[in-house]
Structures are given as C-alpha cells and as structure tokens.
C-alpha cells in the first residue's frame, strides 16, 4: 500500500522519520498527549510514539485505508496507548484536549489553525510542520491564531540532510478557544479567519 510519494528508503528516513522526531528534540514528550491531524502514513505521531513510549497518541485521518494501515502497523510493532479515529478534525468531539496537536502537509496555516487549536489544552502547543517558505502563510494566519487563543511562541528552522530547510511553527495556547470553533470545513475553507 502506497501512502506516501517518497519511496526511496534513505529519503523516507530523512524526509519522514527524522523530520517527525525533531519535535522530541524541542519538547519533553514523556507522559504527554498528542493529537496528529491528517497523519497519513503516521507521520509525525508513529515515530514520536516509538521514541517515547509514554506519549499518549491520538490520530485522526479522513481516509479509512490510512487508519486501517495504522491499526495494522500498531498491532505488528506492539504500540500501546494509541487511538485511531477515522474522521475529520472539525467533526471530532472537544471532550478531550491535548498537550500537543501536530500536522504535516495538511492545509494552509490559516485553515489548519482552526482545525488544530480548539483541541489544544491551555498552555499546550500547536506545532505546524512547514517548509522554509512559511512567512506568507504565517502572515495570513495571524488573525486566526489570535481569535483561537494562541500566540506564536517560536519558529524553529532545521536541516535534516535534505535539499530543504524544515520549520516548526510553535504556537502556545494562552486562552480557551471560543466554543464556536472549529466551524464546518466548507465554511473554514470559504471564509478562513
């Protein structure tokens, strides 16, 4: 089953695994919870879980074949404390909030912020994996970030032996997100905050 466009083994390690685990060099993930939105083949959450067994992982993805793959993978490599949800982030219950919410290659930041920040605990973090060309997205997302109760805490640029510089945009949740968010996806896409 092909869940990623990158198939050369060395490139998979660099562009998926190393990129995914960089978050663990920035934060202590022990005994924390993470929601991975649109995880696809399980990046960044599965490598982070392998690295940090006490990390409580929840993955949501809109394609059932991806969720089925991740379920099979989790069973084969004996991953525990992992919840797999077939669905859309904006339709997920807000009963549970997370220490971290992550997303890689899901949407532009002004849309992604509304999908992610409602599920971050106060004083928790939304971490967006982006390329070095993040500035335009960041500029257009400033209003959304503010309305959803977060601030940009830091921008971390890093290289992983590829031709690209990667970036973690780290947003800290400083107040609760208004309960009207996230809106339905059609509205988020048509009228981003």
Q: What name fits each language-model region?
A:
Residues 139-193:
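SAM/dcSAM-binding transferase cores
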Residues 41-54:
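Conserved SAM-binding loop of SAM-dependent methyltransferases across substrates and taxa
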Residues 90-100:
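A short acidic, Gly/Pro-enriched loop at the edge of an enzyme's catalytic core
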Residues 1-31, 35, 65-82:
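Class I SAM-dependent transferase core
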Residues 99-113, 118, 132:
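A short SAM/SAH-binding and catalytic strip from SAM-dependent methyltransferases
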Residues 56-61:
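Conserved SAM-binding motif I beta-strand of class I
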Residues 120-122:
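Helix-to-beta-strand junctions that scaffold the AdoMet/dcAdoMet cofactor pocket
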Residues 66-68, 134, 138:
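Short alpha-helix immediately C-terminal to the canonical SAM-binding loop
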């Amino acid at each position: 089953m092909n869940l990623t466009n990158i198939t050369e083994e060395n490139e998979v390690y660099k562009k998926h695994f190393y990129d995914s685990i960089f978050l663990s060099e920035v934060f202590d993930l022990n005994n924390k919870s993470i929601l991975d939105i649109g995880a696809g083949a399980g990046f960044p959450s599965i490598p982070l879980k392998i690295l940090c067994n006490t990390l409580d992982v929840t993955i949501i993805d809109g394609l059932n074949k991806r969720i089925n793959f991740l379920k099979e993978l989790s069973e084969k490599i004996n991953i525990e404390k992992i919840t797999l949800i077939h669905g859309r982030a904006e339709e997920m219950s807000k009963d549970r909030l997370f220490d971290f919410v992550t997303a890689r290659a899901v949407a532009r930041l002004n849309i992604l912020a509304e999908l992610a920040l409602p599920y971050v605990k106060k004083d928790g973090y939304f971490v967006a994996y982006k390329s070095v060309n993040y500035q335009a997205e960041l500029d257009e997302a400033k209003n959304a970030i503010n309305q959803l109760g977060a601030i940009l805490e830091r921008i971390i640029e890093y290289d992983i032996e590829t031709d690209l510089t990667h970036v973690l945009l780290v947003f800290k949740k400083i107040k609760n997100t208004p309960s009207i968010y996230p809106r339905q996806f059609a509205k988020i896409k048509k009228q981003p905050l």
